[in-house]
Amino acid sequence: MTRKQAIDYAIKQVPQILPLEESDVKALCEQVLSTSSDDPEQIASKFLEFLGHEDLSFEFVMKFNELLNQNDKKEEKKTKNVHLEHTAPTSWKNESKQPTNNYINKKGDEKPKKLKDEKKSSTTRPTVQPSNQSTQSNPIKEKKEHRSKGKLQSLQEIDEAIKMLELRDSGSSKNCNCQGTRHPVFDIAPNCLHCGKVVCVIEGLNKGKCGHCHEQLISDNERTQMVEILNQEKNELNGSSSSLSNASNGANVPKKKTKTYKITSGMGKNLFAEQDKLFDFIERKRERERKRNEVLKLQEEKEESEAKERQASEHDHKAEENPELLAAQERLDRLLYFQDTSAERTKIIDNASDFDMNQEVGLWGSARERALALKKQQRNLRKWEKVEKERNGRREKYVVSMNIGSNGKVTMTEVPKDTENVIAGSDDDISDISDEEDISDLKHIHALKSEINTTKSLENLHLQSKAWDYERDKKQFDRPTYVKKNSDTAQQNRKTEEKAHDMQAYDLKSRVQVDQNADASVEQNILAVL
């Protein structure tokens, strides 16, 4: 790749970061390359000043510098190969015809014999190196380029992260006190855990330590864990890419074997009877498989129940040991569950509240008021269903006018309905409505409202007419009259009551009757009592 191809890469990538035209991008690249003297750090800083400190801009700068470095190396190789072709003497040509083993075993410090002739013939040309170095380096570079092209982009990112997290001291340590204002914050360790300093990307990547207290931002254990995770992801991606390549190359994938049944018919055999036997056999086999699956399912359920019981017992044991830890774990699980299901848990769909008219009625509303609220709710629900049908494309067309032209052409005009206001008003004009059901409901609503208003007005008049009248209230009650009793009559009544009481006592017989005859025995009297 040449410098022009690097600029072409910039022309493709820069418009994704900033809305610039092709000419502006070319001018920007030429200006940066001319003022930076091919220094990668200066090129990166100037591009970042223009493009901003974002992920896309960092990726673009790294790729651009890589392309420029590859260009320089390739140009040097090409110049060396050209000089070798033009300046190689005859003695070197003869040596190149020797076997490859001798050619490879030659030392790089050997000098050609005819150096004087070379100096005379190539005064304006640079010094020539042995050809074995160039021939050996070319296949290595080609292999590396071939390997890098075959990898995925995500694998390259993982390799870069692994290299960054390797446990080795980097010589180029930089301190940056921007506190994340100029450069983006280091996501892995945004601030130091010892002094609290905010760490930017430059300080985190290049140094790995805090510039204030000189403590490590990431511990050794965390680094090793991150490297293991990245290696695991890399292996997974390599496996997926290899499987995709095998599938694209048409690798043999094992197919599932299909069961086939054959029916042989011979002389004197009924084919339909053989088919019936085969179908019965297949049904019995399926029934056995179904029963087997049921048994396996029951076993799995038993195992799951046993595992749950074991977990519950362990849970209770832990609760007995440390109840505070158990309560904290349950709270954490509940909060994580709420976090996962927050979108569904906070979504409230309450269509009935939009059409609820019970605020006017209350708990002690009359029968007419409740009927009026029900009619309003039914009308609103019907209107809402029509609006939903219109949203789904099953709307009714309302023709306003129909005109017949001179050529016999009929034109019909249609008015779009207002779907924003879903709640139907109870005081709508009947002349503006074309639906017969809606008109009948509205008439009924108006009649109920008029009846309710008349009853309320009559009740108000009745309450207003009620005033306390002393004379009218006095006529409702009669004056009490007191009767005086004579003392003689009271004494006579008392005597008659005493005589009646004595007569009742004389007439009563005792429950236990004992024979008065002396001849009767005591045993008979006891038995009579019992």
From Swiss-Prot:
Cross-referenced InterPro entries: TRIP4-like, TRIP4/RQT4_C2HC5_Znf
Stretches with biased composition (Basic and acidic residues): 75-86, 106-121, 290-321
Molecular function, one GO term: zinc ion binding
Biased composition (Polar residues): 88-104, 123-139
One of the protein's GO biological processes: ribosome disassembly
Disruption phenotype: Defective activation of the ribosome quality control (RQC) pathway. Mildly defective ribosome stalling induced by RNA arrest sequences. Sensitive to anisomycin (stalls ribosomes in the rotated state).
Superkingdom of the organism of origin: Eukaryota
UniProt modified residues of type Phosphoserine: 426, 431, 434, 457
Annotated stretches, region: Disordered: 75-153, 290-323, 479-502
Keywords of the record: Cytoplasm, Isopeptide bond, Phosphoprotein, Ubl conjugation
Subcellular location: Cytoplasm, Cytosol
A Pfam short name: zf-C2HC5
Crosslink feature (Glycyl lysine isopeptide (Lys-Gly) (interchain with G-Cter in ubiquitin)) location: 509
GO annotations of cellular component type: cytoplasm; cytosolic ribosome; mitochondrion; nucleus; RQC-trigger complex
KW Cell cycle (keyword) present: no
PANTHER family to which the protein is assigned, alphabetical: ACTIVATING SIGNAL COINTEGRATOR 1 (PTHR12963:SF4), THYROID RECEPTOR INTERACTING PROTEIN RELATED (PTHR12963)
Further details from the record: Present with 1710 molecules/cell in log phase SD medium.
SUBUNIT field: Component of the RQT (ribosome quality control trigger) complex, composed of SLH1, CUE3, and RQT4. Interacts with SLH1. Interacts with CUE3. Interacts with HEL2. Associates with translating ribosomes.
Summary of the function given for this chain in its UniProt record: Component of the RQC trigger (RQT) complex, a multiprotein complex involved in the ribosome quality control (RQC), a pathway that takes place when a ribosome has stalled during translation. Specifically recognizes and binds RPS20/uS10 ubiquitinated by HEL2, promoting recruitment of the RQT (ribosome quality control trigger) complex on stalled ribosomes, followed by disassembly of stalled ribosomes.
The protein's name: RQC trigger complex subunit RQT4
